[in-house]
Swiss-Prot record:
One of its GO terms (cellular component) is cytosolic tRNA wobble base thiouridylase complex. The keyword Transferase applies. InterPro entries: CTU1-like_ATP-bd, Ncs6/Tuc1/Ctu1, Rossmann-like_a/b/a_fold, TilS/TtcA_N, tRNA_thiolation_TtcA_Ctu1, TtuA-like_LIM_N, UPF0021_CS. Binds 1 [4Fe-4S] cluster per subunit. The cluster is chelated by three Cys residues. Belongs to the TtcA family. This is Probable sulfurtransferase. It comes from Methanocaldococcus jannaschii (strain ATCC 43067 / DSM 2661 / JAL-1 / JCM 10045 / NBRC 100440). PANTHER family: ATPASES OF THE PP SUPERFAMILY-RELATED, CYTOPLASMIC TRNA 2-THIOLATION PROTEIN 1. Its EC number is 2.8.1.-. GO terms for molecular function: 4 iron, 4 sulfur cluster binding; ATP binding; metal ion binding; transferase activity; tRNA binding. It is an enzyme of class 2 (transferase). It holds the Pfam family TtuA_LIM_N. Zn(2+) 1 binds at residues 40, 42, 58, 61. CDD domains: CTU1-like (cd01713).
Length: 341
């Protein structure tokens, strides 16, 4: 017997109602589950998903997590009374975030002193802009600032070194090779002069991984060993790296949520081609296996325990600073520059 038009209408209505009901239930469950996933463990709304830990973090818990890791790197021996820490500050995100975190970690430590060192290499249109960011930051957070100029210290700006083709005459391939050595020399010199117990450098986890893998690929065993060494005493101020366990992405995010203004433009002399390619390789590995950056660092630190190579440290005959030969690299360059000029 055929259904009447009335019965067919009722059946169609019931079918539509059932479909509608299931769709609403599915949508409700999806929204509810999504909401549940996007909550931080503290109950607040999450704003960041940390893939390698499989955690959703709210802004406050994210901030605490970053500072906890920096504190873990430093340890109780460094976070203590009557300590003086020099901070190498450039105006970029890493150094300013590092300075901000150190300010937070030491704000309740009696007689702890922080002093920032800003090295002005003399790069027009770049370093003068960075200096403005640094001065504003140090003023806002009441940090002592000492500005160190290449021109005052070695008699030349980096612009002059490059413009006059002194690099090729010194048998130096890139401006970064010259600049990096001189910067480290000057930071150590002034940290020592100011009586600092430690010198903080803003290398993040990505920087570590890139340098480690670049040295592996190039087979540069000497650099692999020296990169992990922490020289101290006898003319060296021990270097500390509070951002060692913090990925670059999270350094940027920390700067954003704390409204830290920093210089975003890269140095015009920076040569990022090889490092940039290595960065891409690490990003691919991290995407496929979250946490691989930490694995690279841990593996390297384990390897260092087996590379117990002792290098004889001498004193430079000119400046008195520690070096491996009779004259340190900076003094040997300055001698050659005088001969060239």
């Amino acid at each position: 017997m055929l259904d009447s038009p009335h019965n067919l209408y009722i059946k169609k209505f019931m079918l539509c109602y059932i479909i509608y009901y299931f769709l609403i239930c599915h949508l409700y469950n999806h929204i509810f589950n999504l909401r549940e996933i996007m909550l931080c463990s503290c109950g607040n709304e999450a704003f960041y998903y940390q893939k390698y830990s499989n955690r959703h973090l709210c802004k406050e818990c994210f901030k605490k997590d970053i500072e906890r890791r920096a504190k873990k790197v430093l340890g109780k021996d460094i976070i203590r009374n009557n300590v003086k820490i020099g901070i190498g500050i450039s105006g970029g995100k890493d150094s300013l975030v590092m300075a901000y975190i150190l300010k937070e970690l030491f704000k309740h430590i009696p007689n702890a002193k922080l002093i920032c060192f800003f090295v002005d290499e003399g790069i027009k249109g770049f370093r003068n802009i960075a200096e403005k960011y640094v001065k504003e930051f140090c003023k806002e957070y009441n940090l002592d600032l000492k500005i160190i100029k290449f021109e005052d210290e070695i008699g030349y700006t980096l612009d002059e070194i490059v413009k006059n083709d002194y690099l090729s005459k010194l048998n130096i391939g890139k401006p970064c090779s010259f600049c990096g050595v001189v910067r480290r020399y000057l930071l150590n010199k002034h940290a020592l002069k100011e009586g600092c117990d430690y010198l903080a450098i803003g290398h993040n986890l990505d920087d570590f991984c890139q340098t480690i893998l670049m040295n592996y690929v190039e087979g540069n065993i000497k650099n692999i060993i020296q990169f992990g060494k922490e020289f101290e005493g006898g003319g060296f101020v021990k270097r500390i790296k509070p951002l060692k366990l913090i990925p670059e992405e999270e350094v940027k995010l920390y700067a954003e949520i704390n409204n830290i203004k920093y210089q975003r433009e890269p140095c015009p002399y920076s040569s990022l081609s090889y490092r940039h390619r290595m960065k891409k390789v690490i990003e691919i590995l991290e995407e496929e296996k979250p946490g691989v950056k930490f694995s690279i660092l841990r593996g390297y630190e384990k390897l260092l325990k087996y590379l117990n190579v002792k290098e004889e440290i001498r004193r430079c005959e000119i400046c008195g600073f520690p070096c491996s030969g009779n004259i340190c690299k900076v003094c040997s360059w300055l001698i050659k520059l005088k001969e060239i000029k």
